[in-house]
């Protein structure tokens, strides 16, 4: 029978113990920086070693999260952190950034790699790419339905992990820039400010339009087991130990077809109940909810009862003891478990004043293993001369023996290499970068754009206007949809084959699945902002994958942008209403679905500011910043090209903005430098 894994969050030591004692098979945790929950208490590199030891002795695996984006200035610290994680003996590392992948492969090639949900694997192609890169496990995107997970499971051999309980991000994982753009705290760097939980209103004036209920798939866990998902993950490294215990206990019971306490699970934490909308493919208004006063107060009544789930230490390991007492020699205790044996010596036994030490009394004293992970199963007792040993001396042997056995069993070693991050040198580029034009609609096209080096249009927009487009005197690139689910992959390949016949051989993608699809179609691959490239190692990694050029993340400051150096040509956005959230559950839907929706609407924040919201073929929606980026007045050295990212603008507005740049003028109207003048935390 397949062994399924319950994977629990451990934001700190107490949560870790709650997870283990409640029945988790594995925990995931973060150390200091470089993890997606930097505001959790987390673990130091020293406490990590103790955490790994504690878990290993209780047959629980530890996965360390290094699932954030890294800047060049942090590469040295990243390499040091990777070495400490390898020394701890952790069972795997969960990663997002390909710089972290490189560091792990150079320092500890034996360490298993798990692809974080931040890598946005939502199709077969993305899973295959990570499988080819040597990942042993992939954490699938939260937005997938059961049938979509099944399709991925059918095509890849790597382990698959799925979130089954906890908070739902409104955005597709790895594609949210809301927190960063509105402040200095990036979700891609573990410091999400949860701006989506504030009171956003949609076109129907419905409040909290970006706040989803927490997910709970426990009632459908057998369906996930049936399709072959390997690991069931609970979200919640920021939550209290009672929550962790309740979630683990409930999941365990659900997997064993037992009744679990739904009321307690909802009371300890929820946002007006739970949803399984994504799993069922029912992405409607019932998925939305926010944390109400009664959700907060209901937790108080269940916390005390939930403590009982993790109050007592578990002792899963059978131990066998052998105690030898001989004249004029120190007492010897052998303590064995799981194929390992500890040997300790103690006091010299004495002639008894009354009665010798009996096997029964020795067993009783040696059985008091307390907070250790062992229980005494048998004792082999040798006392040929009828000697005695004080209870305190027997207890000391027991403590030392258990401690030594813990040290032996709790250790796991990897081969570790003393690798260092490479030193990069600046690469000279053209005095003024080449320009690219990205249009949302072909109706925005102007002859002025023939001065650009490249024109980018959505794949479907090219197909609608193929006869006109194939006659244009400018190079064309097809932008793949930002989200391509398993049921759409073959259709995308067919569309690429059609435009290839018209001479279009360049494709733009911001997702690793898109890279795999474009390779399969025989296209030149241009990486966009969605790849989240924030350092030189990541840039090199995408170059090694065969990309022709890359657009760097717009979460980079001007200084960080200039620090990136690699052989692959690179660019950045110079203008545009930046896409700050990519979502599959539509916030604009009403009880009547998409009725009367044009697909070009706005969402309004609590200050009354409107943010453009564009629907893409009813497959997904994109929230754009309320103010357009413009950095044409900055000295963007070290870039090969800059891209004008046009979305909601009219043709005339597009012309004016591009013309202003070409004539060294600043376009009229409100604009922002974005994060170019700010350094993210």
Q: What positions do the PLM features span?
A:
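Active-site pocket-lining/capping segments in soluble small-molecule metabolic enzymes
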Residues: 2-121, 139-143, 147-233, 238-541, ...
